Amino acid sequence: MISMRTHSWLLLALFLGISMLAERAHAQTNPNSNPAPSQPAADSDSPSWLFPVAKLDERLPRWLHIGGQYRNRLEGPIGIGYTGTNDFYLLDRFRLIIGIRPKEWLTFFGEVQDSRIFFNHHIANANPFEDSWTLWQSYAQVGSSTSGWVDALAGRQVLLFGDERVIGPSNWLNVGRTFDVARIDLHQSGYQVSVFASSVVPGSSTYLHRAIPGNNFYGVYGSFNNIVPNGTFEPYVLWRVAPPNPQLPEEVGHGHLNEVTIGLHVEGTLPAGFDYDTEFDGQTGSLGVYSIGAWAGYVGGGKAFPSVATAPRVYLEGNYASGTKNPAGRDWNTFDSLYPSNHDKEGFADQVGRRNLVQFRVGVEENLSKKWRIRQSFEGFWLATSHDNFYASSGAIAVPARPGASRHIGNELDLIAEYKMNKGLNFGFGYARLFAGQFLQTTTRGHDYQYPYAYMEYNFSKSGSVYGKVVRSEPAGAYRW
């Protein structure tokens, strides 16, 4: 296994080599050549020498672009598995992007990823913590996602829709999630409709990470900005099929999965600084001999106070995902969370999954300055039914069911801070603590789970990565927790 020192020297050598290429390209640039495509506005107080890749990219031919990202995160979980086990480690992730656009209507996009963990003692050197030098994205796109009315894509790509409660790349994880996909997007001003057929790419020991045969995911996802005033209306239909497979823990021992999810996501703003966000899903189909009948719902609302010095936003959230009340019967009511970006959706500690769950949260977000943002939140978790399991963020069983036991999983406190120099460079740190409730005290050793962390994220351009298919733009001022 490559050592931390060797890995750091390799990345440093790559960074310095790119810097030298950028300077050499600058010295040899023909003053009469065509200017590079304009980049999004970036903070003027950010020194350009911090972004040598951006300088090199500006001097490459118009049809060729390079970019990428480097991220470090220290984590020190305490109470792993609700026991006295602790760990402290460094997560390291490097992504390199190459985009080729010979025509406005034709794009080839490639991205490799190297994710590693160092200094760990109890956390495994495996997905989702480590997956070295893998093909993360690789696709060809015909048509433009920002002009015209249709484009088509085939290859390996990250999928991201709505609030990522159902489909997302799970970017907080060191490895994350990507798909082998074929998709067609129809778009005009005010709407986009995506039709796709895909298969999630699992972690494995191979560089290409071939998908599991028969584990397929199909969908039609619409996004309309002209139906709800000052809001977005997103209906969707998803179809998932999967074989019995030990790599799919939610299906182990139950049989073949054939499941349809019908959902609706609506979010927007209201007068007087109020905002709202809702999403509801219903599921039907079969899982082996079981008939599926499950549902989930999320409702959130907030109120901003822009006239206050820190411009706080106070918010409330409620979240429900059904569970199976009678495991001996033929009805399967456990909600399938599909492929979400779960981080912070069910707590920042990422110990709770959206299956057999009741959650309530209250919090406040504040801007200490233009670059500093903080957030504090408190939430409670309960099992929807004590006859079903307690599920982890991954969807796997965290603690088996104990019928008749208390449904109270615990309460969580989250304290989060982020300093964003610009879209290219930002830092963050925080602390989350899940206080064990009666259920965890009864079914485990009952230790609280604590999650302190600190991270640095560096994009190769101070304007952020702008290449590849635009799936959804980040709203102005959006939190990146």
Where are these regions (language model features)?
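N-terminal periplasmic/intermembrane-space "pro-region" immediately following the signal or transit peptide
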Residues: 2, 9, 15, 22-87, ...
